Amino acid sequence: MLVLGLETSCDETGVALYDSERGLLADALFSQIDLHRIYGGVVPELASRDHVKRMLPLIRQVLDEAGREPSDIDALAYTAGPGLVGALLVGASCAQALAFAWGVPAVGVHHMEGHLLAPMLEEQPPAFPFVALLVSGGHTQLVRVDGIGQYQLLGESLDDAAGEAFDKTAKLMGLNYPGGPEIAKLAEQGTPGRFVFPRPMTDRPGLDFSFSGLKTFALNTWQQCRDSGDDLDQARRDIALAFQQAVVETLTIKCKRALKQTGLNSLVIAGGVSANKALREHLERMLGELKGKVFYARPRFCTDNGAMIAYAGCQRLLAGQHEDLAIKVQARWPMESLPAL
C-alpha cells in the first residue's frame, strides 16, 4: 500500500510517501520558523495561511522525487489532531479533497501517535512492549505501549510541557524562537555548578511532571543577574546549562521510575525535545545501567514531519480503518482513546 502523508498540526508543513513493502520513498518539509520568529512564537492564522501556500508544491515535490503519479496513491493519511485547529483543517481539507478526487480512502492520524511510531522508520525499530517518553512543545507524557493503539498513560505534565518551558525560558532571556535549540547551544558553553535548579516533583512518588516552577526559577535567576550587573552573555550560558540539566535529569528520573514500575527495559523517546543531545546521552547511560535500550528517530524525524504520519496512517489503513468523507479535526485528543489494532 502506497500512502501519502500530510502533517500540518502547527508550524511545519510535512509531506511523505510511505510504501508498506518498501518503506519510506520520499519526504519533504517546510518549516515556518523564520515566519514566526519575529513574533517570538507561533501565530496560528499565519501558520494556517502558510500551510495553504506550501501544501500542493510539497506534494508535487514528493511525487517527483519518488517517481510516482497521483494514480499510484492507494490512500492518504493526515494529522487530525491534536494541534492548532486552523492548521489541522488545512491538511484535513487537502487530504479529503484529494482522496475524493483520486477515489481512495483517507485516515486521520493522531499527531502524538505519529511521533511515538517515528522510531519504527529506523533500521532497528523497537519491539512491543515498551515505555515511551513523548516530549515536545505541547506534550510531556510517559506511556506504556503494548501495540499500536494499546496505550496506557503513566504520567504527564500538570502544567507546561518540557518543550514549552524551553521556549519560554529562552524568550525571557531574549533568545530567538524556537528556544530549545538556542538553550542547548548555549548550555554547551555554560559554567557547570554556577546555578543549580530544582528537579521538579522528583522528591515525591508518581510519574507526573511540572515545569512551570522551573521556568519561574529561571526568570528569577535571570533578573538577579541583570540587577547585579553580571556579564549577561555568560549568565545566559550558565542559566541555559542549569535549566537544561534540570529538565534532562527530571525526565531521566521519571523514565527510570516508569521502567521499574512496568518491568520493561525498552524506552522510546519521541517528539521535538527527543533531539536534544544531552537528553539522549542521559537516557542512554541510564538504560545501560538497567541493561536496557533506548530508541529514537533520526533528528529530522523528531520534529513534526510527514513521514511519521504516513507510517502511522499506513498501519491503520492496513487494519481497515478509514474516515468518512468529512473534515473532522480535534484540538485536544487523548491518545488512550484510539482504537487498538
Swiss-Prot record:
GO cellular-component term (any)? cytoplasm
- Compartment annotation: Cytoplasm
Q: Alphabetically, which GO biological process terms does the record hold?
A: tRNA threonylcarbamoyladenosine modification
Q: Organism's domain of life? A: Bacteria
Quote the record's binding site residues for Fe cation: 111, 115, 304
Q: Which cofactor does it need?
A: Fe(2+)
Could you say which EC number(s) this protein's record lists? 2.3.1.234
Q: Which InterPro entries match?
A: ATPase_NBD, Gcp-like_dom, KAE1/TsaD, TsaD
Note on how the cofactor is bound? Binds 1 Fe(2+) ion per subunit.
Instruction: Identify the keywords attached in UniProt to this record, alphabetized.
Output: Acyltransferase, Cytoplasm, Iron, Metal-binding, Transferase, tRNA processing
Q: GO: which molecular function terms?
A: iron ion binding; N(6)-L-threonylcarbamoyladenine synthase activity
Q: Which transformation does this protein catalyse, written as a reaction?
A: L-threonylcarbamoyladenylate + adenosine(37) in tRNA = N(6)-L-threonylcarbamoyladenosine(37) in tRNA + AMP + H(+)
Query: Which positions in this protein are listed as binding substrate?
Result: 134-138, 167, 180, 276
Q: What does this protein do?
A: Required for the formation of a threonylcarbamoyl group on adenosine at position 37 (t(6)A37) in tRNAs that read codons beginning with adenine. Is involved in the transfer of the threonylcarbamoyl moiety of threonylcarbamoyl-AMP (TC-AMP) to the N6 group of A37, together with TsaE and TsaB. TsaD likely plays a direct catalytic role in this reaction.
Question: What family does this belong to?
Answer: Belongs to the KAE1 / TsaD family.
- Name listed for the protein in its UniProt record: tRNA N6-adenosine threonylcarbamoyltransferase
Its taxonomic placement starts with: Bacteria, Pseudomonadati, Pseudomonadota, Gammaproteobacteria, Pseudomonadales
Q: Which gene encodes it?
A: tsaD
